[in-house]
């Protein structure tokens, strides 16, 4: 399961190349009704061995379900806010428990709830914590992080002077800058 609708096409290619003998289908809201029905039936019959999808995929019946993977488990996109409210991540954990199969909750920045379930209190861990031994790119270091107190460095059009200076110096060197904002729209 993936949090965003734009992820399945990229991941679908990689998974299909890695598991060429297994039929893979995707399930997400961008599929037309006919394609979604075809993919759902393939999963339900067991013809499709791998289902890749957004939170909708958690409801797909699969006769020989053996593993559930939730990529970026911390992402709020797994929570349905309208109508019937649910957390697809929590439903995936429940389904795995009911089917006595493993579930992998993957994240470089796990939710506090998952972190607490993995690190536990006095030996009461509910999840088994696995960590990567190194960086995805060998030799890559961690980025430099600087916290800026906006009570001291005032905002100018939403950006602080140190941030504006850092962007200007990168642009002067012909480099790019990417700003992540914590809101949508």
Identify the meaning behind each predicted range.
Residues 3-4, 29-30, 56, 73-74, ...:
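Short, ordered loop/turn segments at secondary-structure junctions
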Residues 8-10, 33-37, 60-61, 76-79, ...:
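Switch/connector loops and helix/strand junctions flanking conserved nucleotide-binding motifs
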Residues 1-17:
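Conserved Walker A/P-loop ATP-binding site and its immediately adjacent core
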Residues 44-50, 55-104:
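SF2 helicase catalytic motif II
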Residues 1-4, 25-27, 176-182:
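Conserved RecA-like ASCE P-loop NTPase motor core of nucleic-acid helicases/translocases
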Residues 14-51, 59-65, 121:
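Conserved motor-coupling elements within RecA-like helicase/translocase cores
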Residues 89-185:
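Conserved interdomain linker/interface between the two RecA-like ATPase lobes of SF2 helicase motors
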Residues 25-33, 75-86, 151-157:
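Flexible beta-alpha connector loops of hexameric P-loop NTPases
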């Amino acid at each position: 399961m993936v949090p965003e609708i734009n992820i399945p096409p990229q991941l679908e290619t990689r998974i299909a190349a890695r598991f060429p003998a297994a039929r893979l289908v995707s399930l997400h809201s961008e599929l037309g009704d006919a394609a979604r029905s075809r993919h759902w039936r393939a999963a339900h019959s067991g013809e499709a061995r791998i289902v890749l999808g957004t939170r909708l995929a958690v409801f797909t019946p699969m006769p020989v379900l053996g593993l559930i993977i939730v990529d970026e488990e911390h992402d709020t996109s797994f929570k349905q806010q309208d109508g019937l409210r649910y957390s697809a991540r929590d439903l995936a954990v429940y389904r795995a428990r009911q089917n006595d199969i493993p579930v992998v909750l993957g994240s470089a920045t796990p939710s506090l709830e998952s972190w607490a379930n993995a690190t536990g209190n006095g030996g009461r861990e509910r999840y088994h914590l696995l960590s990567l031994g190194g960086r995805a790119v060998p030799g890559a270091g961690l980025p430099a992080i600087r916290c800026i107190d906006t009570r001291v460095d005032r905002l100018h059009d939403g950006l602080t002077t140190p941030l504006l200076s850092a962007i200007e110096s990168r642009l002067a060197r012909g480099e790019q800058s990417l700003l992540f904002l914590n809101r949508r729209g």
